[in-house]
UniProtKB/Swiss-Prot annotation:
Residues 1-26 form the signal peptide. It is found in: Secreted; Host nucleus. The RxLR-dEER motif acts to carry the protein into the host cell cytoplasm through binding to cell surface phosphatidylinositol-3-phosphate. The lineage of its organism: Eukaryota, Sar, Stramenopiles, Oomycota, Peronosporales. The keyword Ribosomal protein does not apply. Keywords: Host nucleus, Secreted, Signal, Virulence. This is Secreted RxLR effector protein 22. Coiled coil: none annotated. It comes from Plasmopara viticola. The gene is RxLR22.
Length: 125
């Protein structure tokens, strides 16, 4: 019975972590020096809550690091906290475009070679 209870608690904790309800890790919370001293900027936590509900991204203004929060599959926020889906998608698109560009360059080089061969044939005649 204790084993089942501890397994459920562990699973609930992992789900909570993957959904973005993690405590702040050092420089991910922006602090501002106000009259009374340092106070945590509440807008940053609001953005984090919004991203956790929608499965979006949180960009830390202090560190400049984008952290994926929740969404995108089970436990993705727990196992890959800095995983950037948009960047991976852009890399795939760029790779595809570079393949198309290589094909274009190959065809252009072939046309250029044919023109040079034609000029050499005209000069030899």
């Amino acid at each position: 019975m204790r084993l089942i209870y501890s397994a459920l608690v562990t699973a609930a904790a992992m789900v909570a972590i993957s959904n973005g309800s993690t405590p702040a890790r050092g420089n991910e919370v922006e602090t501002r020096s106000l009259r009374g001293g340092n106070e945590v900027d509440s807008s940053m936590s609001d953005d984090g809550e919004r991203a956790a509900r929608g499965g979006g991204r949180v960009r830390s203004q202090a560190s400049g690091v984008t952290r994926h929060v929740g969404g995108g599959g089970p436990f993705i926020g727990f196992w890959y906290p800095y995983y950037n889906f948009e960047e991976k998608k852009e890399k795939k698109e760029k790779h595809h475009l570079s393949d198309e560009y290589e094909e274009y360059r190959r065809i252009a080089a072939e046309v250029k070679r044919k023109r040079q061969d034609k000029r050499l044939a005209e000069r030899q005649d």
